[in-house]
Amino acid sequence: MKFFNLNALAAVVTGVLLAAGPTQAKDYKSITIATEGSYAPYNFKDAGGKLIGFDIDLGNDLCKRMNIECKFVEQAWDGIIPSLTAGRYDAIMAAMGIQPAREKVIAFSRPYLLTPMTFLTTADSPLLKTQVAIENLPLDNITPEQKAELDKFTKIFEGVKFGVQAGTSHEAFMKQMMPSVQISTYDTIDNVVMDLKAGRIDASLASVSFLKPLTDKPDNKDLKMFGPRMTGGLFGKGVGVGIRKEDADLKALFDKAIDAAIADGTVQKLSQQWFGYDASPKQ
């Protein structure tokens, strides 16, 4: 086995750094932002194939504040982080939760949205008869009483067929908290909803910011939300912009722009427009 002479290596590195001079902040003129394109109302395509939604509107607003020209591109969810780290685009705005596992790989802006998670089933499902004593459940600060209530609630899912989008915090939560439940994973949330309505699965789990607009639609009266509204834990710290770890200057630009968009009510206005309620973080 070979060993490095650490003193010699340190001297070489120091010399290289001195020769290179101080690090210069990157001057961003234009960036490319990836989004999934199939997660309404965050990001989806209109009849003409144009990307629209909350993420798109907010992203364009942030880019104006940063004085940067931005281009949105569509990227399948399962490859969205690997393609960022590979340099195929500069940022991600795709309803992506700021979660510990993801933070090991990429950096995030400050949260631009806060939304709890809850369950979805059909209007005729016996699951709706379940009584739960907890309406809001912060998983980072769960009390013994809340944990007992959650355990009692999750027991109703024995024998229930669950469907969730693959690679999401919803899948991670189900596998950790309900390992005995039968879980099917899907490439898009739209396919989850389609199978739920067709009776191929019994329930799902997603964000309220996705589920409320979904269940408010007249043609989705057969779908109902139920159960506690959960935050924190595996669901993370909110929704943020995904950025490469080495692009700290870009993160700083997004953080400043998001602060301003929250302060002047833009995030609140857009969340009311797209989700039907205020999901903006507080300053």
Curated annotation (Swiss-Prot):
PROSITE patterns (alphabetical): SBP_BACTERIAL_3 (PS01039)
GO molecular function, one term: ligand-gated monoatomic ion channel activity
Disulfide-bond pairs as recorded: C63-C70
Main location: periplasm
Signal sequence coordinates: 1-25
Matches recorded under Pfam families: SBP_bac_3
GO cellular component, as recorded: membrane; outer membrane-bounded periplasmic space
Subcellular location: Periplasm
Keyword line: Disulfide bond, Periplasm, Plasmid, Signal, Transport
Assigned protein family: Belongs to the bacterial solute-binding protein 3 family.
Job of this protein: Component of the nopaline active transport system probably consisting of four subunits: Q, M, P and T. This system is also capable of transporting octopine provided that catabolic functions are induced with nopaline.
Matching PANTHER family: ARGININE-BINDING EXTRACELLULAR PROTEIN ARTP, MEMBRANE-BOUND LYTIC MUREIN TRANSGLYCOSYLASE F
Protein name as catalogued: Nopaline-binding periplasmic protein
Organism: Agrobacterium fabrum (strain C58 / ATCC 33970)
